[in-house]
Amino acid sequence: MRCRPNVKQVKARRGGVIKSIHKYREMGVRQSLGTDTFPLDMFNDMRMAATVCRIVEHAVDVAPSHEVFTMATVGGADGLGRPDLGRLAAGCKADIVLVRTDTFKASPVYDPFKFLVLSACGDDVDRVIVDGRTVVQGGVVLNVDMPAAVARLNEAALRVRSRIVL
């Protein structure tokens, strides 16, 4: 069965919504959650997916946080045809994001999935391990000159924008 991508924020910005996570699930449709637009923020996209579904369905239980998290991890990997991603299992890439839960914002943590989906943001990320290598430590991206990268990005955006006819 094909995997249906769910891009809530993009749809909502354009005045539309993808109706319901739980109705697709009940029909046996595998779902993934992803983003392809600014801001590239999976925490925000998980929050948006849960919130939009709850608004559309007028019910809080239709987009459980653990299911939205699964859409963003296992569902995303499955949607890409990558069984080696999105899960912590033997033979899979060791891609791990460690999020701080010892902060005032996160406390008390009754349900880590609810925190990750409904409250967390990039600033809560402490460490990121990609294929077994630490690439973020203490919330800081390692081996990247971020100010220089941002400057190059802004310069490239200006070049592209100058070529666009508005």
Regions found by a protein language model. Give the residues of each.
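Thr-Gly-centered strand-to-loop micro-motif
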Residues: 5-9, 33-36, 99, 131, ...
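His/Asp/Glu-enriched, well-ordered alpha-helical/loop segment
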Residues: 19-103, 119-121
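Flexible loop/turn segments at secondary-structure boundaries
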Residues: 12-14, 39-42, 105-106, 136
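Active-site microenvironment of metallo-dependent hydrolases
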Residues: 73-166
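A conserved active-site cap/scaffold subdomain adjacent to cofactor or substrate pockets
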Residues: 1-31
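Conserved strand-to-helix beginnings and helix N-cap segments that scaffold or border functional pockets
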Residues: 15-18, 43, 110, 147
